[in-house]
Curated annotation (Swiss-Prot):
The keyword Cell inner membrane does not apply. Belongs to the RNA polymerase beta chain family. The gene is RPO132. Coiled coil: none annotated. It is an enzyme of class 2 (transferase). GO terms for cellular component: DNA-directed RNA polymerase complex; virion component. This is DNA-directed RNA polymerase 132 kDa polypeptide. It catalyses: RNA(n) + a ribonucleoside 5'-triphosphate = RNA(n+1) + diphosphate. Keywords: DNA-directed RNA polymerase, Metal-binding, Nucleotidyltransferase, Transcription, Transferase, Virion. Its main location: virion.
Length: 1164
């Protein structure tokens, strides 16, 4: 089918972003931002954090100081590849070493004398072990010369015992916009955080809160716990900015609605009343008095001048090197937002908006942990020096303190799912889907306690700020993660920046701003504040804001600043601010540029002819004004057209209102949603369910399973899908396969395939259709003495063990077989016994229902014997296994039919799978039919006009009409078989065939939808879930089957199971199982007076309630279930009286029966 290049130019530009871009160092786009994030940490940021020189202790007015210096930081990559690490069963770590020097500085008249106290040159091979991120092709950032494995995308850490770990990205708690909160009616707070720039180490955090109560405007204060004074916000702004109150009034009132101006006047008047209430008021004296009061309150050891300098110098750490006057103007701009937000809350970004948040990526996790653990390490050294000086009178450090930085434990906890001790961020990759290597590292989630603290459920809704940057389909639809985890769209990524790049970029932007006329950037009274990462640098003339932003964006796209991901946001709506963002953790994605009402893509004439030979970075260099990288904040405050088609339908005046234009709808999906087909042609819930099922599909090998002992389920004969999307192809999901093509028929089969039941052909299974292999890890720890003990009596459980006590290779394990010898022995205290040694088997048994072959055995000998066994099992589809299409048509095997039982077409072809046809109508999955039609059309013409094999592009979300796809299928059949009549062609296009009854060999009355489709096998396997048993262990409390397959558990028999048996008329079975079972049977004595259950005291049944009242109760014995007795006892213990009352009936008397004469009639 010939492409309309003009209408698909936006689609082709979007595809250029998805494909690799070697010129820009991008070899795998989906996880590139994670690779860069981790690379920045281990190559640069780790050195910056660990390289320290600072005082530990100071004495004698700072003339004597104990100093610490950490230097010579070296990071060494491992000597082996990730595959070797898996074979050895070890982790894949880099080694970091450093040198610590502790010395004493004494200031003398001759200068500074230095005395060495202690030093340690870290050459220990286990000083700091940093889990190394495996990137695309098994590469790592420290050794890029490793061999390339094209289908290994990486993005994982190999933890100890060769377990792969993958983590999500967490939303940072600190917000870049202040948080507005209504405390109570007419009482509000405005909280914001200030964090020092990345070049300031250790990082300083300050959290401030501005409070405002309409009834007490004099108490409109700013405060911070133990780090700042509580002071009126207006007076603090006046103190810092050195302007009059009238200046502040005019600045707050400029371009504000009348209601806000009224509140501004009231706040300024309240500040005036404070100044007028103090005789000879002086702002400096006022602030100094508050600082002195705070100094006394905190009982600080510092002098008053040192205390004041620390408090005011460290005020607003993100503006650390900024003059106090700019800090004052910054506070005025915050107060403007606060007052405006009181009346117009809906126009201000709320705390759940992604505009306010940055994202923590892999590198940021390790950076945060390294920073925290280094501070703990230095704190331990300081405490040890103080203790030694106190106890011994010498400045010394124990070598144990110097050699235990604590980073190893922190990193190990991180990969075990703990970030900052309490917050879960990482989870083990379960190995059942290759796709999860992409989906998990590209997911963004909130802190688990973030929602609990805020006590808000709006965070669980699809927030408007997530539009275009997050996939609206791939979201959890049930469970605790609903609304808390979102998947990035295929065009979205997260920014990263080095400290040196940050400083250079900040310098270039400041130089550009200061290149403007001085008076135009000094409009601090009525201008638009310009901030760089929330730090105020200038205030722009309001008449120049549009020209400034337009020129800044053009220069950014042309590479003037050396960074194409700078975000510039023009905030209007009376808040009046220009925000420039350059930091890491911002969500960015490309957009098509609209300049002065023209789509720049249409203006560039040469772009269309040269596009095929260009990469995305080439387009950015040679056609810089076509595409712009836009962060989520800039997008939120910009006018963005939904699509190119809608933009071209607008008038010229309407076009001038827009700044950007979006790409087609398929680029708004994530990579998991891109594996689906035509979700916009289906009902809405099918997209969400389809994403969940696609992640549960069994795919091909994610790594060499024979060389690593880990769990996994893998497809044995995978096939590349024919109907794909561009994102599915560029992400290598298509090449790494997650299903097979099968022939399906939509029809009813003898009433067996009702609801979700499917019929599957027996010969299809025998030929390896959707066959899988299960790799399972079994791990046991055995005391060394138990492992060395010999068994006295031959046990059947040890029949698969060799003489060394380990299971044999290639042995087939069955349920009950031991995997290693574990014999516990005990000595009897009996002098007359001939043999006072007894032994018994305590080994862990193989518990799976199916036999498995032993593939590998690993043993580690320490104080215990650690045995790890890898078993393999081929598992063909059986009854109860689950399958699905890519349109969320999930089915369960209801019957395995022989080929002779299935209907066939004129060529003798029988369907591999029969699906109930009513499922299409009930679930409204039209795209499933389109997929079958397109796959069948491909089989008719698998090559394009140039003789090249070409898959069919059917994106997950597309704006193409169904008629277009029908026309494409029609052309394929006409090309391969031009002699077809119209009816035959229609049957071919719509996959309608006449099938024949296998019993009568007569054709069915109606045609059947019959064709190929890509089918997925899910990880929900019957034999993994079967826990039904007749006998076994029961819990002590409720006497129901215990839980867990490993503990031999079963399924509880409750009300729903009872209803099922009632439906089948099994009343006697219910009585036997629920009531008459020996284990559940319970004799209970009931008091007929009060209805209590009698207690048994010294073998005598008595009613406690009646005995205390000196009554003589009548106890009646009844038989009931143990569960009923436990329920009544538990309710009584909670203060709920459940009275068992007996049915009172009046006695019934029957009249005497009439006598019946049985004599023969002839004798009467």
């Amino acid at each position: 089918m010939k492409k309309n290049t003009d209408s698909e130019m936006d689609q082709r530009l979007g595809y250029k972003f998805l494909v690799p871009d070697p010129k820009a160092g991008v070899f795998y786009r989906p996880l590139h931002f994670q690779y860069v994030s981790y690379s920045n940490f281990i190559l640069h940021r780790l050195h910056e954090i660990l390289t320290v020189k600072r005082p530990l202790l100071s004495f004698k007015n700072n003339t004597e100081r104990i100093m610490i210096e950490i230097s010579n930081v070296k990071v060494t990559p491992p000597d082996y590849s990730p595959i070797i690490a898996s074979i050895k069963g070890k982790s894949y770590d880099a080694l970091a070493t450093f040198t610590v020097n502790i010395f004493k500085e004494v200031m003398t008249k001759e200068g500074i004398s230095i005395t060495k106290i202690s030093s340690y040159e870290g050459k220990d091979s286990h000083l700091i072990k940093i889990p190394l991120l495996i990137g695309y092709g098994n590469k790592n950032p420290l050794d890029t010369a490793k061999y390339l494995v094209p289908n290994v995308i990486g993005g994982v850490f190999i933890n100890k015992q060769s377990v792969e770990k993958v983590g999500i990205n967490l939303v940072e708690k600190i917000t870049t916009w202040p948080k507005f909160r209504v405390v109570k009616p007419n009482s509000f707070t405005f909280s914001f955080s200030s964090v020092s720039p990345p070049n300031v180490l250790p990082t300083r955090y300050r959290h401030y809160k501005i409070s405002l109560d309409i009834s007490q405007l004099e108490a409109s204060n700013i405060s911070s716990t133990k780090t700042f004074i509580t002071v009126n916000i207006v007076l603090l702004s006046q103190y810092l900015s050195r302007v009059s109150l009238e200046f502040i009034r005019r600045s707050l009132s400029y371009d504000m609605p009348p209601e806000v101006v009224y509140l501004v006047n009231a706040i300024i008047d309240s500040a005036k009343r404070i100044t007028e209430s103090i005789t000879d008021f002086n702002i400096d004296t006022y602030i100094n008095d508050l600082v002195e009061a705070e100094h006394i309150k905190q009982k600080s050891q510092l002098t008053i001048n040192e205390f004041k300098y620390e408090m005011l110098h460290n005020f607003l750490p993100h503006m650390n090197y900024t003059p106090d006057q700019l800090k004052g103007f910054y506070m005025i701009s915050l107060l403007r937002k606060f007052l405006y937000c009181i009346y117009h809350t809906s126009r201000y970004p709320d705390r759940d908006s992604m505009v306010c948040h940055r994202i923590l990526t892999y590198g940021k996790y390790f950076e945060t942990l390294a920073h925290d653990e280094l501070e703990n390490y230095i704190g331990n050294i300081r405490n040890d020096i103080m203790n030694n000086h106190k106890n011994r009178g010498t400045y010394a450090v124990n070598i144990h303190v110097l050699t235990t930085p604590g980073l190893n434990h922190a990193f190990s906890s991180l990969l075990s799912g703990k970030f900052k001790k309490s917050d879960g961020s990482y989870r083990t990759h379960p190995h059942y889907s290759w796709m999860q290597n992409i989906s998990i590292p590209r997911s963004v989630g909130f802190y688990p306690d973030q929602v609990k603290i805020s006590k808000m459920f709006s965070v669980r809704k699809y927030h408007p700020s997530q539009y275009l940057y997050f996939c609206s389909s791939d979201v959890p639809e049930r469970g605790p993660q609903v609304g808390l985890v979102s998947q990035l769209s295929v065009l979205s990524s997260i920014t990263n920046i080095l400290t040196s790049e940050y400083l250079d970029l900040e310098k270039k932007i400041c130089e550009y701003i200061r290149s403007y006329y001085k008076d135009d950037i000094s409009y601090f009274e009525t201008g638009f504040p310009i901030t760089i990462e929330n730090a105020l640098v200038a205030s722009l003339n309001p008449n120049m804001i549009c020209d400034f932003v337009t020129d800044f964006r053009r220069r950014k796209r042309m590479g003037f600043f050396g960074n194409l991901e700078v975000g510039i946001t023009l905030v209007r709506d009376h808040m009046n601010e220009i925000r420039i963002n350059i930091g890491a953790g911002r969500l960015v994605r490309p957009f098509l540029v609209v300049d002065n009402g023209e789509l720049m893509m249409d203006v560039c004439q040469e772009l269309e002819s040269r596009l095929d030979d260009m990469t995305f970075s080439d387009i950015q260099k040679e056609f810089p004004h076509v595409i712009e990288m836009v962060d989520i904040e800039q997008f939120t405050f910009s006018n963005v057209c939904e699509s190119v088609q809608k933009f071209r339908m607008m008038s010229k005046d309407e076009r001038k209102q827009y700044d950007l234009c979006d790409f087609p709808a398929e680029f708004r999906d994530g990579y998991v949603a891109s594996s689906l087909v035509g979700i916009n042609h289906n009902s809405g819930p099918r997209a969400i369910l389809g994403c969940a099922q696609a992640k549960q599909a069994i795919s091909c090998l994610s790594s060499d399973i024979r060389n690593k002992i880990d769990n996994g389920i893998h497809l044995m004969y995978p096939e590349r899908p024919i109907v794909i999307s561009k994102a599915l192809e560029t992400s290598k999901i298509a090449a790494n396969c997650f299903g097979q093509h099968v022939t399906i028929a939509l029809m009813s089969y003898k009433g067996i395939n009702q609801e979700d039941g499917i019929i599957i052909k027996k010969q299809f299974i025998q030929r390896g259709g959707l066959d899988i292999v299960t790799a399972k890890k079994h791990q046991v720890e055995i005391p060394l003495e138990n492992f060395n003990n010999k068994e006295r009596d031959r046990s059947n459980a040890y029949s698969k063990l060799e003489s060394n006590g380990l299971v044999r290779l290639n042995a087939f394990l069955e349920s009950g077989d031991a995997m290693a010898r574990n014999i516990s022995s005990r000595t009897l205290e009996d002098d007359f016994a001939r043999d006072n040694q007894i032994s018994f088997d305590v080994s862990e048994k193989y518990t799976d229902m199916y036999k498995s072959r032993v593939e590998r055995v690993q043993v580690e000998l320490t104080d215990k014997v650690k045995v790890r066994v890898l078993t393999m099992k081929e598992r063909r589809p059986i009854l109860g296994d689950k399958f699905t299409t890519r349109t969320s048509q999930k089915g369960t095997v209801a019957y395995i039919a022989d080929e002779t039982e299935l209907p066939y077409d004129e060529n003798g072809i029988t369907p591999d799978v029969i699906i109930n046809s009513t499922s299409i109508f009930s679930r409204k999955t039209i795209s499933m039919l389109i997929e079958v039609i397109l796959t069948a059309a491909y089989s008719a013409k698998p090559y394009n006009n140039n003789g090249e094999n070409r898959p069919v592009c059917f994106p997950s979300s597309n704006e193409t009409s169904i008629d277009t796809y029908m026309q494409f299928a029609k052309q394929c059949y006409e090309h391969s078989n031009p002699q077809l009549t119209d009816d035959e062609l229609s049957d071919k296009v719509f996959c309608e065939k006449i099938l024949y009854d296998p019993e009568t060999d007569k054709p069915y009355a109606s045609k059947v939808f019959f064709g190929p489709i890509y089918y997925l096998r899910l990880r929900h396997l019957t034999q993994d879930k079967a826990t039904v048993r007749c006998r076994g262990k029961k819990t002590k409390l409720i006497r129901q089957a215990n839980e867990g397959r490993k503990r031999g558990g079963g399924i509880k028999f409750g009300e729903m199971e009872r209803d099922c048996l009632i439906a089948h008329g099994a009343a006697n079975t219910i009585t036997e199982v629920l009531k008459d079972s020996e284990e559940d049977y319970q004799d209970v004595y009931i008091c007929e007076n009060c209805g209590d259950i009698a207690a048994q005291i010294k073998g005598i049944n008595t009613c406690l309630r009646c005995s205390k009242l000196n009554l003589s109760p009548l106890l009646t014995k009844i038989d009931t279930t143990h569960v009923s007795k436990v329920f009544l006892t538990q309710m009584n213990a909670r203060g709920v009286k459940v009275k068992l009352d007996f049915e009172r009936r009046p006695p019934s008397f029957y009249k005497q029966l009439d006598k019946v004469d049985l004599k023969p009639s002839f004798l009467k």
